[in-house]
């Protein structure tokens, strides 16, 4: 689950980090009032969406008066912002953040952290190249990114943060401020179950103060039950409607741009299914994992979800029965096909627990389902069914 910038800054501030002060505004008048409240000569109006690249897309503007703040807010709120991280429709802007002007600054740094699956540790990253796309820095100048793996038994130690500060070229009071920032960020990361955290840029002001000018936080969705207050910050308007509906039925769904709908049990098998569809010349319309313990109700909802996509011209169902029984899946498929009134070809591959029984149920149903013998045969048949 992603947080908006203003939410991320509020959370980080509660852990002792110095952040760029700001006020969220849901309409142009509130934006104008926020400018006056901040009391500076300048302010920055930022569209609050769950996407990066806002500045390049026109979602970040410097304003010099309350009237300008009102005008910029009016141009953003109620519109969709399209950035390099969104699809063609963009993300809806329901609010803007009006933030204090912290510039000029002497330096812009980068600080971030992720759960590194290879090392199985929280890994911090820091760079002197703040204020730009960190992906470009990682690609073009990987040596400019410092990495610190944190031992989960002892946590981030002050000496590790100081070492990073020295390597970033900080000095004097800046070092202590950076250490406090990094330690506070780690504490927030662990206590709030972050999956990803970024401050870009982390600015060094002329007075030596270190301030978080931006904030990006992604929370581990599997841990949200432990954080009801954070869950209350969820903005469903920023989520894909189909993915949101899928999550309500405990389905793992990601919309893609192809025309072959996929229903699979198990993430690994789902990825392999998408790969082989591509190999045979097709394009998957989605990633959909119904889970290892799929129920009949969940399979029916998955079918509806796939066919809600107007781009889907064929469906491939690939089930390997382990915990889930193939005969139960077959019954759910029949029920779903009848309920949804399917008009596109449906290829079904069943293997494993009660696969033969499931295949017989499908064959005796009288429905025009296309059976497949093996994954390659399934991919070949679903691609050919498109004509």
UniProtKB/Swiss-Prot annotation:
Mg(2+) binds at residues 200, 214. Pathway: Carbohydrate metabolism; tricarboxylic acid cycle; succinate from succinyl-CoA (ligase route): step 1/1. This is Succinate--CoA ligase [ADP-forming] subunit beta. It comes from the Bacteria. Its EC number is 6.2.1.5. Residues 9-245 form the ATP-grasp domain. The keyword Nucleotide-binding applies. Disulfide bonds: none annotated. Its cofactor is Mg(2+). Binds 1 Mg(2+) ion per subunit. The keyword Nucleotide-binding applies. Pfam families: ATP-grasp_2, Ligase_CoA. GO terms for cellular component: cytosol; succinate-CoA ligase complex. It catalyses: succinate + ATP + CoA = succinyl-CoA + ADP + phosphate; GTP + succinate + CoA = succinyl-CoA + GDP + phosphate. It comes from Francisella tularensis subsp. novicida (strain U112). It is an enzyme of class 6 (ligase). The lineage of its organism: Bacteria, Pseudomonadati, Pseudomonadota, Gammaproteobacteria, Thiotrichales. ATP binds at residues 46, 53-55, 100, 103, 108. GO terms for biological process: succinyl-CoA metabolic process; tricarboxylic acid cycle. Belongs to the succinate/malate CoA ligase beta subunit family.
